[in-house]
């Protein structure tokens, strides 16, 4: 048995919130075997019990088991706790529009979760995840390495998929990252983006540049606003964020380190402090070990500061 297999069998992930996002996250963790035990918790008793039963009926075919219910004790002794509970983003709403109501939910919820799992890592998925990461840290007093959010991890995956489609290459060759707010002010780090080591602005086919400035602008916009289109069409985004959370859980539970774009509370990052926003982070069993000092050009640093200012304003409005 490998070290990861042994760790996985002994580990527990809890997902708080049995809505479309939480249930999809629990399902993704279950079928991938992200941990040995997946627990789903929600105060809506009938809903969560139905979701748990539906998941449990298929565990003959999964490498993990599932439990859960409407008692917060179902989350006890978790290694990683994902928070997906909160008001759902409606068509036309920005993520920041949800800040006030979801912040109040979180201030009540977080102390209960920490009491059940005092040594856990806590991952915010509920939007606006950057703002709520600050709220969650303040509500618990936990260090920033243990309270963070999925941030732009999904946005980065969206961007890489779009680049892959445009360049007609395998996605594993695409290296590009979105940073800043998980929301309208996010932006790609085009200055370091590349395809198999070739700067993205230099990628050419038959001598013609594939990624002109107009193309890059369109791709950035499409990645940032993809969720709005999905919400308009089906009411929620759930499958991709479920897979995102499962992948993050594995990075937090397995030996070794990963580099992922996550949102954590910044301390003097390009002069930014007191807000959570996404940067490439070193991730391990200890949570976020540090922020990667990725190279950024002058325009990108200005965009990061503008994104931080936007988040500062929202935090001030719900203080």
UniProtKB/Swiss-Prot annotation:
Catalytic residues of the enzyme: 182
What are the protein's UniProt keywords? Answer: Allosteric enzyme, Cytoplasm, NAD, Oxidoreductase, Phosphoprotein
Q: Which residues carry this modification: Phosphotyrosine?
A: 228
Gene3D superfamilies with a match to the protein in the record: Lactate dehydrogenase/glycoside hydrolase, family 4, C-terminal (3.90.110.10), NAD(P)-binding Rossmann-like Domain (3.40.50.720)
GO CC, alphabetical = cytoplasm
Spell out the activity regulation.
Answer: Allosterically activated by fructose 1,6-bisphosphate (FBP).
Subcellular localization:
Cytoplasm
Q: Where, by residue number, does NAD(+) bind?
A: 21, 42, 47, 86-87, 108, 125-127, 150
Q: Which residues form a coiled coil?
A: none
Q: Which PROSITE patterns match?
A: L_LDH (PS00064)
Q: What protein family is recorded?
A: Belongs to the LDH/MDH superfamily. LDH family.
Q: Which HAMAP family match?
A: Lactate_dehydrog
What subunit structure does UniProt give? Homotetramer.
Protein's name in the database: L-lactate dehydrogenase
| Species this chain originates from | Cutibacterium acnes (strain DSM 16379 / KPA171202)
Point out the gene that encodes the protein: ldh
